[in-house]
Amino acid sequence: MNIALLTAGGIGSRMQQDIPKQFMNIYDKPIIIYTMEAFQKHPDIDAIEVVCLDGWHDILRAYAKQFNITKLVGIVSGGKNGQESIKNGLMDLSKKYSPKDIVLIHDGNRPLVSQEIISDNIAKCIQYGVAITAI
């Protein structure tokens, strides 16, 4: 299986807004939904899990339902920083999936990930056991 682990645990303090930036709307859709749609549309992604701020889980679930994100399998709380948030997500996934499954970790505030980048990362993980994208 290929699982997308999206991080959306930050508060976006530099944005100086009342809501976290991943939930800010652009053209009537939250940024996190654009990111989720990129992985939802990819034929090789089997599941999506999101690491999310406490207090925003139900809102994220509602948006996922509204925008037909059917691959969402879980939402887990973030940590004190990005590293801890990723750890929380990976620990939760380790209870559900095999160590042989591929996990793509992606920043939920970066919605412009292409289908090609997702495909290339999966292919490189299969070939080498690990992959990283730097833009």
Report each predicted region and the residues it spans.
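Conserved beta-strand scaffold positions in the cores of enzyme catalytic domains, especially
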Residues: 23, 75, 130-132
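Conserved beta-loop-beta/alpha segment of the NTase-like Rossmann-fold superfamily
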Residues: 82-135
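N-terminal glycine-rich phosphate-binding loop and ensuing alpha1 helix
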Residues: 2-58
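Gly/Ser/Thr-rich helix-start
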Residues: 10-13, 29, 79-80, 90, ...
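Small/polar loops that bind or transfer phosphate-bearing groups
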Residues: 7, 51-52, 77-78, 105, ...
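Conserved N-terminal catalytic core of the sugar/cofactor nucleotidyltransferase
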Residues: 33-100
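Hydrophobic packing residues within well-ordered alpha-helices of enzyme cores
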Residues: 15, 60-64, 121
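Glycine-rich, phosphate-binding/catalytic loops in enzymes
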Residues: 21-25, 67, 120-122
